[in-house]
């Protein structure tokens, strides 16, 4: 696909601010300078009328910041059952031998397990929990399907960091996700405190797309899931975003849930505290935003990272308890 370069608006300390005037409005990892491109998509679709889960004030907060933290969504029994399931999976040889299981760099400690909603009946039920799925449907203004699910673990003393990134940048370039009409929800299964590497988000960063430097190597996912080196924003763009919006750590008790936009800049520090951290991530994508071909001739990533074999709307479960 031949692209016409975007129009340059102005330079800011080495970062080019652009308006989208090209075929791919969110071009990234091309042979050009790092750039900041204004978002061309809504944040809350259909004015939040598709479902009734969040209040008007909560929707406004999400639209402004690019995320929202909901506390005490799941009770102690729910959290205990889910955490036990994640711990079981992370020590099950039949699961840890799969490509879905990612270990820490330089260690055999499990860092992430992908496709958990298909590897576990309990997590499958969680994926369809009304407390999660109705929020996704309301924000995205449509029925939704599971683009990706994973459990992220950060063991005490040795859990590694996740560097700053926008999920959409990767999903757009490497998976062919057309537009910014997806979100992640992180279900906290342990207390996330200031010391054990909580998720950190940059408020307002979802309104600007950071076009990144560097072409994507073949099978990039094999390295990026351990330590991402391509599709990461340049330091000047990160500094600009942080100076504009600050950085907010999602410190909260187990049972809380963070919903954040697919383009919100986020990352987390390593965990050198004694307290492990464990969260389950569900990525809901709109049924009107299904994947196309990856950009720039890349081959599709595996199904457990980016679902594309079938796009089937998730039906909310009737029961809300996950402990049973």
Residue ranges of each PLM-predicted region?
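Short, Lys/Arg-enriched N-terminal segments with co-localized hydrophobic residues
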Residues: 1-2, 6-17
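N-terminal auxiliary "cap/dimerization" subdomain that precedes the catalytic jelly-roll/cupin core
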Residues: 13-145, 253, 322-323
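Non-heme Fe(II)/2-oxoglutarate
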Residues: 19-48, 92, 96, 215-218, ...
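Glycine-rich nucleotide phosphate-binding loop and flanking beta-alpha elements
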Residues: 76, 170, 266
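Conserved double-stranded beta-helix
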Residues: 106-116, 120, 131-201, 206
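Short, surface-exposed loop/helix-turn segments at secondary-structure junctions
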Residues: 165-169, 232-244, 295-299
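A short beta-loop-beta micro-motif enriched in histidine and acidic residues
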Residues: 172-182, 245-246, 252, 275
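Double-stranded beta-helix
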Residues: 194-264
